Amino acid sequence: MPVSASLAYKNYDYDYDSIQPYFYFDNDDEDFYHHQQGQPQPPAPSEDIWKKFELLPTPPLSPSRRQSLSTAEQLEMVSEFLGDDVVNQSFICDADYSQSFIKSIIIQDCMWSGFSAAAKLEKAVSERLASLHAARKELISDSSSNRLSASYLQDLSTSASECIDPSVVFPYPLTESSKSNKVAPSQPMLVLDTPPNSSSSSGSDSEDEEEEEEEEEEEEEEEEEEEEEEEIDVVTVEKRQKRNEADVSDSRYPSPLVLKRCHVSTHQHNYAAHPSTRHDQPAVKRLRLETSSSNRHGKQRKCTSPRTSDSEDNDKRRTHNVLERQRRNELKLSFFALRDEIPEVANNEKAAKVVILKKATECIHSMQLDEQRLLSIKEQLRRKSEQLKHRLQQLRSSH
């Protein structure tokens, strides 16, 4: 809070006589129906009703029980504030800001704007600021001025803390110089330094918000990875263990996100390629090698890691993938062999499986008809041969 406002609250110059016209007319002996002549009366309903609200702002805090400070002590107190750089940055505003503060001394209050009380208050504050600037110039030239004791400074800090925080009233920051970012070389993360008059809860709140945002990002990444892992059919994918959320909540400074590259072993099959006769034996060898290697890796993981259920699931999934890959390869080879047996699609390497099956069905029906026709011809020829044999025997017997 600016020291001008705190001093205006602490050392106020108004007495009852100067502010008496701004209060309500209150008389205990007054009769509201028979007003006495020659005495000031409250405003009638026809008059401006807003004149009732021409009051000064909230009165300052009650004065302390200590003796009032003399003029020299007050100037010493001001010099103490003006001499310290840290306090000067956080408590004392610039010249531009003081002008804007005078212009907007009453902010966000529709009851005070545009009245004579606001003008008088601004005039008093401007006079106070002018006197403070003059005192500061005089005290800076005097290098042998004595420092104020710690009790006075503590009293001023407590009185400033009891006043309203200007960040609640003013929507914009006080000074840009008071908000500086400092990087600690020993820590990988940024630490923000707060002004001296700010509360310590703001830093903890910002750190909690950062931790919550990082936890949300990690949960989203883990959900995406789980969705990708649910679609495993043939390709072997190693499931990464989920990060324990208790470690994230317990850690005071969360560690930055680490992105790891995982190699996914994929086997692409060219279904349009010509079938090879040397494919069956290497497939069996590869199956044995992969099963043996998977069993060996599974045993090592069982010995090293306590989570044996995950390793067993990985071994089962890997074995299932190998068997499924072998089954698909055998099915593909059988389709290639069937395609080569059908004359219509034998030369078409890009024939679809449905076309191969349809042409194979038609070819089978035509072959069955040909078989029946040939069987009937064979039967006719057999009968004819029997007749010829019987006639030949008759001719031999006659001779």
From Swiss-Prot:
Residues linked to a glycan: T58
GO molecular function: DNA binding; DNA-binding transcription factor activity, RNA polymerase II-specific; protein dimerization activity
Keywords: Activator, DNA-binding, Glycoprotein, Nucleus, Transcription, Transcription regulation
Major subcellular site: nucleus
InterPro entries: bHLH_dom, HLH_DNA-bd_sf, Myc-LZ, Myc_transcription_factors, Tscrpt_reg_Myc, Tscrpt_reg_Myc_N
PROSITE patterns associated with the record: BHLH (PS50888)
Domain notes: The 9aaTAD motif is a transactivation domain present in a large number of yeast and animal transcription factors.
Record-given protein name: Transcriptional regulator Myc
Organism ancestry: Eukaryota, Metazoa, Chordata, Craniata, Vertebrata
